[in-house]
Curated annotation (Swiss-Prot):
InterPro entries reported in the protein's UniProt record: Ribosomal_bL27, Ribosomal_bL27_CS
GO molecular function: ribosome binding; structural constituent of ribosome
Naturally occurring in which organism (per UniProt): Aquifex aeolicus (strain VF5)
Key word Ribosomal protein present: yes
Gene that this polypeptide is encoded by: rpmA
Gene3D superfamilies in alphabetical order: 2.40.50.100
Protein's recorded name: Large ribosomal subunit protein bL27
Amino acid sequence: MASKASGGSTRNGRDSISKRLGVKRYDGQFVKAGNIIVRQRGTRIYPGKNVGMGSDYTLFALKDGYVYFETRRKKKFVSVLSPEEWEKVMAQKNGKVH
């Protein structure tokens, strides 16, 4: 005779492994060609200048330069700018147009 009623089995107890998605290189960071900038599901962020997109929507640098995030027409874009372009963009942002 059992001294205790058997407990019911649970339907929980599973967990999927994390996919490590998200931004890997942030605005203003220097990247080398081939560096992954964003891992994503679908096009949450679109590739801009000097940025390629993999079959899994991963965005990566095509050239060495600085990461630049911007919003155009309600869409987010990420570009890789050369040091000269980066200086120009930062000057415009800070109101120091030559």
